[in-house]
Amino acid sequence: MSKIIGIDLGTTNSCVSIMEGSQPKVLENAEGARTTPSVVAFTEDGEKLVGQPAKRQAVTNPENTIFAVKRLIGRSFEDPTVKKDIAAAPFKIVNSEKGDAWIEAKGEKYSPSQISAFILQKMKETAEKYLGQEVTKAVITVPAYFNDAQRQATKDAGKIAGLEVLRIINEPTAASLAYGLDKKQNKKIAVYDLGGGTFDVSILELGDGVFEVKSTNGDTFLGGEDFDNTIVDYLIGEFKKDSGIDLRSDKLALQRLKEAAEKAKIELSSAEQTDVNLPFITADKTGPKHINLKMTRAKLEALVEDLISRTLPPCKTALKDAGLTASEIDEIVMVGGMTRMPKVLSEVKNFFGKEPNKSVNPDEVVAMGAAIQAGVLQGDVKDVLLLDVTPLSLGIETLGGVSTKLIEKNTTIPTKKSQVFSTADDNQPAVSIRVLQGEREMASDNKMLGNFELVGIAPAPRGVPQIEVTFDIDANGIVSVSAKDKGTGKEQKIQIQASGGLSDEEIEKMVKDAEANKEEDKKKRESVDVRNQADTLLHSTEKNLKEHGAKVSDADKKAIEDASTDLKEAIKGTDTEEIKKKTETLVQASMKLGEAIYKSQEKKEGSPKEGDKNDEGKKDDNVVDADFEEVKEESKEGKEEDKEKSA
């Protein structure tokens, strides 16, 4: 049975984990790291890079290096948060045919699900290399506050990557699984999860293997990226004051600033001061310009104070929804790389009135929780029951543009709820069902997940027909809605897809593209290996011919030279099979040279001593083959004794 893997698909970094025995194990990628940057790049020569190799070349290729794509997944192009990203991102964010936010690189358009799929493929390959078998099933984490469209888009990404996503699990819930797996006592915990692009807070009750989410809240556009952007804005402002040059339109400079901002932010978690040093950031007619300034922790904290403060209202709401006060929380579990920042830790401590628990690795704990959930689904982990909730209320639009809720936020999932509605006009033949997600009273202020029509309603005065609307949320938090005319029995049912989400055909095409790319990548790798082999052979052959050419006939020498010339020509081209063929020809042609070198070496090492010259060529018919054993000489005397005996 193939192993189910757990994946934390993060904004900044991603991570993959499996269950080994009773414990989750985080796996190292090909570069030897336990986390992989969520970065995808398309290079000049058409190569696709994922992870650290993509991040390394970002400064020289900013327009085709895609990062933080999780902030775009499942969002429309017109979303105000997307507009903010368009202003900050060095790569191009474009409007898809259906109105979604997509990315353009090297003239090709990619959906955020596709870019995410490239990252998931890297996670899949990491697990396959470790396990030595194909992996086809996964549990993938998402921010607790992700809406239905974002969850669907994440599931689509898994499908494109060749994974059957058995469960979408909320990140704070996953973290609580990893934190509480071996803990037996009953506890009320808050999971404070501030990652690269999103913020979540969940309140849970843990006890006897039951992990029950009481409430969840958050902000899907608040994280380390915003902290980095704030530092970048500060650096741009300071540079403009000094030089009068605005760097905002310089994509190369922006990428360097972003890297410097991230580095400064990380360093200031342990140091009180750091230097931001960027030589040759730009130039004008007076010559090159440099950034060289000192940044203190106090300055950083002043810059990002508002961002940290934005995490506290969701904490208040989550506590209120759970019916608890801050003092009733036993532990605050810190998750996400941003929780290493001292100011974040002190704000959380002040809010909850106790020291946060830092016992878990904030970068790995979510993937570990996903692996535990995978273990539960596989039957390897017993006595663990996870009760999660829907983060946002679900309902439909009713007369006057009002949002009527059928399922309230923080309802335990899976769940199903029905309500009967009627027509607004006499003899109304059809009703349009607009499905909404959100907490606002008016439909227009909430997120419309989708709409469908129930037709064929029998003519009747308004208010008479009975239309039963049923909402069904599965364990992944994904919504299905049905409407049934109780009079005629006619029914219409849909699984909600984002209004601009990927169709099954588009997903299928992307799956095929991903497979084709995999084959293409293998071919490219093979081509590189074949060329390297050919280069090595040419180098060693030329060296040997120069040193030992006199040991072979002119005809053999010419055959080697001709084969070398042919191979050099083949390397200039793109035909891998031709290079293989010419390499083999040179190998065959060089054999005589190899034999000559070997014989010459043998002769040199095995030439007889002066005293034995007369015996050369004589054959002793009385010689008998015998087994012998090498004996280490113990002393000179022993050696002499042996000599006498043999005489």
Curated annotation (Swiss-Prot):
GO terms of molecular function: ATP binding; ATP-dependent protein folding chaperone; unfolded protein binding
SUPFAM superfamilies: Actin-like ATPase domain (SSF53067), Heat shock protein 70kD (HSP70), C-terminal subdomain (SSF100934), Heat shock protein 70kD (HSP70), peptide-binding domain (SSF100920)
Composition skew (Acidic residues), residue ranges: 623-632
Phosphothreonine: residues carrying this PTM: T198
Keywords: ATP-binding, Chaperone, Nucleotide-binding, Phosphoprotein, Stress response
Biased composition (Basic and acidic residues): 514-529, 540-557, 600-622, 633-647
Induction (record text): By stress conditions e.g. heat shock.
InterPro entries given in the database record: ATPase_NBD, Chaperone_DnaK, Heat_shock_70_CS, HSP70_C_sf, HSP70_peptide-bd_sf, Hsp_70_fam
Annotated PROSITE patterns: HSP70_1, HSP70_2, HSP70_3
Gene3D superfamilies, A to Z: 1.20.1270.10, 3.30.420.40, Actin, Chain A, domain 4, Substrate Binding Domain Of DNAk, Chain A, domain 1
Source superkingdom: Bacteria
Disordered as annotated region, ranges: 514-557, 596-647
Similarity annotation: Belongs to the heat shock protein 70 family.
Function per UniProt: Acts as a chaperone.
Entry-linked HAMAP family: DnaK
Protein name: Chaperone protein DnaK
Organism the protein comes from: Pelagibacter ubique (strain HTCC1062)
